[in-house]
Amino acid sequence: MYPQLPKSYKNAYPFRISAPSFIYPDDYIPNVQMLGPYLDEIELLCFESHESSLPSQETIRELESLAKEFKFTYNVHLPTDIDPGSPERKEKNRFVETLLRVMDLTLPLAPTTHTLHLPCNQAPIGRICDKAWQGRISESIRRLMDAGVKGPSLSVETLNYPLEWVEPILREYDLRVCLDMGHLIANHEKIETTYHRFAGQTTMIHLHGVNNGKDHLALDAFDQSWLDKIFSILKRFTGTVSIEVFSYNHLLASLAVLEKNMR
C-alpha cells in the first residue's frame, strides 16, 4: 500500500495545484487514484510517443471516471522524444502525427492545457537564435494549426534556451506558455523578468528544486532567497502550478515548502 498525502490541497491557493501522474512507482490509474482526492489537477505524463508507453483507450475512460469521482482536472504533457525543429521532413511529420494522435487520445479528459517541448538541438547553445531552426519550428506549428489544433490549447515550456527565441511563434499562433522555474534557474535566466514578459500568456508553471545542476528535486533544495523570488510570482498567479517531481517524498517535502511560503 502506498503512503497517502496527509491532507487535501484542493482550492487551497489562488492557483490550481497539480502533480505528475508518476509520483508512485506504478501505472497511471494507481497514481491518479492516490493523488486525485488531494489535488486540483494531475499532470498526465505522455513523455514517450511509442504506442506501448501511452495510456490505452480503456485507461483513458477510467481516468475520465476518476476525475469525475474526485473532482479534479488534467493537464497533458505531450511527448518529448519528437523534434519539430528537425531539418528532416520525416521527423517533422512524426512530430505532427504524434501530437495529433496524443491530443485525440486524451480529448475525453478535457485537459486544461497541453504542455509542449520545442527542443533546440543546435550546439553549442548560445544567445543567438538559429533562424533556420526557428523557421522549421514555425512550419511544424502551422501544420498543427492547419489540422485543427487551437493555439491557446498548447503551452510551450521553457527549456535550455531563452523563451524569446520562440516569442514570434507564440504571437503568430496565439500559443500559451509553461514557465518551468527549475529550467529557468538552471539556465541562469531571471525568473521575474521572464514572468513579467510572458505573464499574459502563462497558463502553467512547473515547480521543482535545482541543486548543482540537478533538477526535478524537492523544493527544499532551494535556499530561502530563491524561494522568496519564486513565491513572489506564485502569489500573483492564478493558473496551474505543477510540482514536477517524481517521488512521494519529493512531493511531500515540496507541498510542505509550498504551504509554509504561501502563508
Can you annotate each of these PLM segments?
Residues 1-78, 82-101, 263:
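N-terminal pre-domain/capping segments
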Residues 2-13, 30-32, 85, 166-176, ...:
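Histidine-acidic metal/acid-base catalytic patches
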Residues 6, 85-177:
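Active-site acidic/histidine proton-transfer and metal-coordination neighborhood
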Residues 12-14, 37-41, 69-73, 106-113, ...:
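A general structural motif
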Residues 15-21, 40-44, 74-78, 114-116, ...:
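Hydrophobic faces of well-ordered beta-strands that scaffold small-molecule active sites
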Residues 20-30, 46-59, 83-90, 122-124, ...:
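Acidic-and-aromatic substrate-binding clefts and catalytic sites of carbohydrate-active enzymes
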Residues 56-62, 91-100, 130-138, 189-197, ...:
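Charged helix-capping and loop-helix junction motifs
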Residues 61-81, 135-147, 227-233:
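Alpha-helix-loop-beta-strand connector modules within alpha/beta enzyme cores
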